[in-house]
Amino acid sequence: MSSFSITRKKTPFQKHREEEEARKKKAEDETARLYQEFVESFQGDNATTKTFVRGGTINPGDKPKVDSEGEKSKDGGSVSKKGSRYVPSFLPPPLASKGKEPEKKREEERPREREKGKTRNIDNFMEELKREQEMRERRNQDRDRQGDSSPSSRFDELPDDFDPSGRPGSFDDGDPQTTNLYVGNLSPKVDENFLLRTFGRFGPIASVKIMWPRTDEEKRRQRNCGFVSFMNRADGQAAKDEMQGIIVYEYELKIGWGKAVSLPSQALPAPPPGHMAIRSKEGCNLVFSGQTGPPIITSVPNQNSELVLTPNVPDITVVTPEDEHLRHVIDTLALYVLDGECAFEQAIMERGRGNPLFKFMFELGSKEHTYYVWRLYSFAQGDTLQRWRTEPYIMITGSGRWIPPPLPVTRTQEHEKESASTYAAGRTRRAEVERTLTDPQRDEFEDMLRALTLERSQIKEAMGFALDNADAAGEVVEVLTESLTLKETSIPTKVARLMLVSDILHNSSARVKNASAYRTKFEATLPDIMESFNDLYRSITGRITAEALKERVLKVLQVWADWFLFSDAYIYGLRSTFLRSGVSGVTSFHSICGDAPEIENKSYADNMSDIGKINPDAALAIGKGAARQELMNLPIAELERRCRHNGLSLVGGRVMMVTRLLSLEDTEKQRGYEAVDEIPKHPQNHSTWEEVKSEREHIKNSYAEVEMKEPVNLPTTIPIPQPELKAFVGKEKNELILPASKWARDDDEADDEQKRSSSSGSDNTGGITFKADGEDLKGNDCVRAQPDNGMDEEQRQKRRRIEVALIEYRETLEEQGMKNPEEIERKVEINRKRLEVDYGLSGPNEGNRNQKSIIERKEKREDSQESSKKRHRGENKSQSPPRKSSTRERDHDLGRDRDRERHRDRDRQHDLNRDRDRREKSSSHDRDDNDRSKERDRDWRRRGTR
């Protein structure tokens, strides 16, 4: 993470303020130093020195005379100056004047000698300034002399005294932090792209610039210069040491440090794969692609070295072996020979003599041997199995050019164009080239995933690795997706890897270069991951383990929804994929991945044949025939777009995508039907059947838009989630296999309730209630038998479809984890009533008629109970003495009667609903039995006619 830290630059105001403070401090120090020297000079002058006093005659009345030299003398003679040379008076005037001239010179030099005796710092500073001025004048004179012979230009070569070791020269301002390299003596064929590829192998480059000639004189020189600015000093130093003296297009490069330039926040993109210059280890030739031909770069042992080029020798083309196994053997052998050197190769040749697999090592002219030699050299230059240089180069001095094989096509042409395109630096955004993980990095990441657990430290370490290699996000996501879709992975490891995906997505918004690519990459692979988790969830036999896995996965999906990483439709599609039942018609993800084409064709053929078998009954009952046909007619691109938008996998082809879309639609409908469950099962006294019916009609109409668009024979389609009927369709077309145990259990419960109610009534009323109930039930049976006898074929088909749909709906609820039988029965009954209303098999009039008959029966029962209670009270009164009733007792009796009436009303409503449900169950069962008996009669008639 440290590579992404950016040093904060100072503003111009801060720089100006610091310069002013430094200048002010320097002036104060200089003033203090001068003042100290001034004080010391005064202290040195206070010391008294002995002087010579010349003797002479002094007359009291005479005044001292002033001689021509400005000296006073009392006797009229000349008095010499202090410290001057003594001249005898008897010498003639000419000789005396000659002696005075050298004396004056000595007097002028003595103050200088006295000053030299005590040196001061200011004197040293002045001497230094003088020396610098003399050196400056000398350089100007040399430059003038050179200008007389040839005019100067910014394209001139470095001077002979230029020191390439890094000491300050003509092009170095002495800044130790500069990263800008001056590249002189460039060939006119060299451009910025060439410099970028040449110097890009040493490190990230900030900018590349070539000073193109402007005047005719500069063009006649036939050489240019340029600047290459690195992002850090170490890379620039390595490039300077390596490229100093290299010959490119017969021009020897002269490299030095240039003036520091401001660095951008982002370096230029590295050269694309296949165009990267590889660093030489032992001074071997290096080849780079130019505009007119491949330039040859060699190390320069001396000043008279020449370009090594043999144009008359044919090129050597490297061809990749067609046999994949042989190519793998050659690649592996080249890697081992590179490590073990000649001794290992010699041992292999001795042991492999006569082995056809190592025949290429002895046939020096074969294509396999050429490929082997090229692989050795390629690995030595730093190439890998997936990436290598594609430009021709000279491997051996005096031989022809070696032309490497083309790179394998692993990316789309559009991505190649993006990676190859470059723009002007600092003006437009450059296309980033997504790199791949190196072999050690990939092995390290795979080891992390194998040992990954739910410990926070391990997940954090793996997440840090992913962010550090965000520029290779594509391969990181590929490895992680592959590990999450393996069928053999254990549950804890798979959950831990899902947590790692969640951590990477959470940090995809961090200020890390290319970190946001993880969200886009995972968005394309998460549907496949959820398909694998669905297979794992449905294969778990333990209920506790399955619930724990379900809780973990759903929590992760909910967290993603809270983070707003993806759209709600996408998250809901992932959740539906994970919770999808096994009877939804979608083939298992792992079975599809094992044999995708055959499964696709087989599933499509089976689907079409099944539709033909169950048509018209099953197809119309499920309500998917027209919708499936409509989706099958859509273009494949539109299907993929819908699946991607809804978080569904694309694996399995057109048929599986259509099946997933239909399953998702059924799940969405089921979510809408959950709202119907909120309707009270036992309506209060103020709630009528018409109100409940209107509310259900409102809910049903809200989903009318998603029903089939093509007309069918039914009034409306069945809006419930239904998988295919393969499990319930036997060999015969119309023979339906129903679980008899379920219906037998319901009938037994109904019979037991009737027996208990009749027995309780007979005990209380002496058989009066039993008679009334029997007559009422007999009447109801007669009324119920009339529509059964007159029921036409269409109504029987509707009843059959409803029962099949309810069976499937019950199994769907059980597979979704619903364990409460009462809750399941309640939802099934609600669905039954809704379907009967939709098909027109029941209505509000029938409900009112049933309510009226049940209410009358309950009133008769309650009247009989009241009469029996009065009779018992009469018997008690006859046995006990009479007692007068008080006002308190009468009030108590009135309150008790009111409570009894309330309980009676509540029980009456409850019994009404229960009887109606029981009657509907029994009627459907009787009709099914009647249908079976009629079918058997028809079969017997057919056999009799035969």
UniProtKB/Swiss-Prot annotation:
CDD domains: cwf21_RRC1-like (cd21371), RRM_SR140 (cd12223)
Its biological purpose: As a member of the SWAP1-SFPS-RRC1 splicing factor complex, modulates photomorphogenesis by regulating the gene expression and pre-messenger RNA (mRNA) alternative splicing of a large number of genes, including those involved in plant responses to light signaling. SR-like splicing factor required for phytochrome B (phyB) signal transduction and involved in phyB-dependent alternative splicing.
One Pfam family per UniProt: RRM_1
UniProt KW Cell inner membrane keyword: no
Tissue expression per record: Expressed in leaves, inflorescence stems, roots, flower buds, open flowers and siliques.
Subunit details: Component of the SWAP1-SFPS-RRC1 splicing factor complex which modulates pre-mRNA splicing to promote photomorphogenesis. Interacts with SWAP1 in a light-independent manner.
Domain comment quoted from the record: The RS domain (871-946) is required for phytochrome B signal transduction through alternative splicing regulation.
Effect of loss of the gene: Dwarfism and sterile flowers when homozygous and semi-sterility when heterozygous under normal growth conditions. Reduced inhibition of hypocotyl elongation under continuous red light. Plants lacking SWAP1, RRC1 and DRT111/RSN2/SFPS have pleiotropic phenotypes due to altered alternative splicing of many pre-messenger RNA (mRNA).
All copies of domain SAP, residue ranges: 631-665
Major localization class: nucleus
Protein's name according to its UniProt entry: Protein RRC1
GO CC, any one term: nuclear speck
Biased composition (Polar residues): 757-767
Bias type Basic and acidic residues, positions: 15-29, 62-75, 98-147, 772-781, 854-868, 886-946
Organism, scientific name: Arabidopsis thaliana (Mouse-ear cress)
Single GO MF annotation: RNA binding
GO annotation terms (biological process): mRNA processing; red or far-red light signaling pathway; regulation of photomorphogenesis; regulation of RNA splicing; response to red light; RNA processing; RNA splicing
Signal peptide: none
SURP motif repeats: 329-372
Region annotation Disordered: where it falls in the sequence: 1-29, 41-183, 740-797, 836-946
